[in-house]
Amino acid sequence: MPQPTIKVISGPTVEIEYAGLHLLTDPTFDPETTYDLGGGASLRKTTGAPVEAESVLPLDAVLLSHDHHPDNLDNKGRELLSQVPLTLTTRDGEKRLGGNAHGLSPWEEYEITSTQGTKVTVTALPALHGPDGDDTEEIIGQVIGFLLTAEGEPTIYISGDNASLKVVEEIAERISDI
């Protein structure tokens, strides 16, 4: 089996070839734009992706850290999800997205079998999208990272949109071989 390849497309969007699977994280393909977040808040995207969303197809799955902010899932990224057989995301994200979305809680596993028959385990990992604190998730929303494992392959940790070193330490204590 060839070594995994990781290609940064832009921002949080990364194309991954792993154990015979073609994966994509947090699809963002909109051109430069400003998103209205409501309440007078906005988010300005200063640069579009260097490739069109369709150029990454076909995909086996999208690993979506969270769906509720356009800097991790923009309009063209949302359109792309309908062309992908599986989107792994948060439990709340599954409810909002529907369709091919499958929600995971931290430490929950999902197995995908590649066309070559390799079983890849995707483990949802805890992540914190903002400052440490008991009410952060309630205010900012759920976010997860991912761990990719397969026999004979290196382990890959995808932090998602995690901003907490404490969470990384917790993951490192539980999974020593990253």
PLM regions: where:
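Conserved beta-strand hairpin/beta-sheet module of binuclear metal-dependent hydrolase folds
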Residues: 2-52, 138-160
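Metallo-beta-lactamase
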Residues: 3, 86-154
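Metal-dependent catalytic neighborhoods of phosphoester/phosphodiester hydrolases
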Residues: 73-83, 93-94
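Pre-active-site segment of Zn-dependent metallo-hydrolases
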Residues: 21-64, 75-79, 130-133, 162-176
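Short beta->alpha connector loops
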Residues: 10-12, 68-70, 93, 128-129, ...
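A short helix->loop->beta-strand "cap" motif at the edges of active sites that frequently abuts
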Residues: 21, 83-86
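Active-site beta-loop-alpha substructure in enzyme catalytic cores
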Residues: 155, 175-178
